[in-house]
């Protein structure tokens, strides 16, 4: 009887351990290109996840390499929510009233919404105005965990250093330059 109980307990323990290794345990995806954002407040480093959002990462890296984000200003900052940038009009201080209304006009075309990535503090995702497949250049960084956004936006990266800088960003702060490390 004891031998059966021990074997059953050992078997149950193994099943639970194996289950915990994959199902329900979020694991960090393989990292892709690292993006550095030099702002007027300091430097932010982002690790991207092309395994979860390949087209989104490809589009983002292409825009970074084309210097698209350089000299843009953050147009949206909501305390305990997000900071947001990516409107080319934000390079022009005279257009401040219109910042945030457009992107580069070239939608990614797919909604790469990963079940592995969640909106924890420092998550990086693509902003959109109703259809995730129409996201183009505007991206955001979460200032706090926002589970209510999960499944609605394409997450493609995570801040790995400079979260203290992210927390200091205000509307109008400048991206001096962004580059692939």
Feature locations, PLM:
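Cyclophilin-like peptidyl-prolyl cis-trans isomerases
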Residues: 2-3, 16-181
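Sec-dependent N-terminal signal peptides
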Residues: 7-16
């Amino acid at each position: 009887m004891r031998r059966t109980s021990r074997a059953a307990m050992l078997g149950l323990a193994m099943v639970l351990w194996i289950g915990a290794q994959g199902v329900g345990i979020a694991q960090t995806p393989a990292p892709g290109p690292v993006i550095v954002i030099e702002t007027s407040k300091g430097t932010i480093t982002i690790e991207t996840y092309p395994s979860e959002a390949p087209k989104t990462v490809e589009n983002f890296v292409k825009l970074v390499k084309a210097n698209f984000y350089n000299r843009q200003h953050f147009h949206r900052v909501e305390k305990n929510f997000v900071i947001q940038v990516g409107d080319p009009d934000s390079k022009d201080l005279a257009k401040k009233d219109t910042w945030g209304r457009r992107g580069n006009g070239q939608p990614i075309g797919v909604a790469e919404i990963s079940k592995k990535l969640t909106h924890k503090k420092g998550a990086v995702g693509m902003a959109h105005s109703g259809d995730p497949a129409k996201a183009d250049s505007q991206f955001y960084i979460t200032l706090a965990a926002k589970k209510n956004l999960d499944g609605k936006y394409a997450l493609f990266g995570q801040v790995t250093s400079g979260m203290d800088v992210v927390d200091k960003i205000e509307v109008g702060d400048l991206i001096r330059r962004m580059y692939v490390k």
